[in-house]
Amino acid sequence: PINLFYAYSFSQMIYTADEINQSSGFISSVSFRMHQSYCVRNLSVYLQNTNKESFTNDRDYVQVSSGDLVFDGDVNLSELVNGWFTIKLNEPFKYDGGNLLVCLDDNTGDYEDEIYFYHYPASEDIRRTISSYTDYFDLTWENAENGDYSFNPTSKGYYINPQIKFDMIIGDELPVIAVK
C-alpha cells in the first residue's frame, strides 16, 4: 500500500464486494499486514465506494477529494499487533456493500529500508492495485496519473492486493447511545 523505499508514494487498491462480504456498514479502521518496521510515516487515507472493478493501466487513478479523506496524520508502523498495523479513521466511513477503493498517500518526504507488505493474488489478468513513487515531490492522484513533472514518478500496476482488514459496524445506522 506504500513504498517505504521512496520519499513519496501514492497507491490505490480495489477490494470487491465479494472479498469484503458485507452488505453495508461503517468502517472504523483499516489494517495492513506487513513485516516488522521501526518508522513513522505521514499518511493520508481515502476511501470511496466504487463501481470500478480493476485498473486499465498503471496510471488509471480514480479521482479522490477531501470528501473521501478518512485519515490524515502520522502512523507508527512499529505498533504491530500480530503483524498488522492499524489506522483508526477520523470518522467512520459508510460502506454501501459494493466495491471499495482504498487510497494511501505517503507524504513523509523521507525513505526507510524497503519493508514488505503481505499480499494475495487478485487474478492473472486483472490489475487491482496501482502505485506511483518518487523521491522528488509529493504525489496526488492528479500528478501520479498525468506524470506532469520533469521527474516523472515510477508507476506500476499489480495483479495482487495487499492483505487488509476492516473494523466495521454492521448496519445502515451508527448506534446512538444516550447518557442520562
Predicted segments — roles?
Residues P1-S54, N107-P175:
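Beta-sheet-rich sandwich/jelly-roll-like modules and their strand-loop junctions
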Residues Q22, N42-D125:
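Aromatic- and Gly/Pro-enriched, solvent-exposed loop/edge beta-strand patches characteristic
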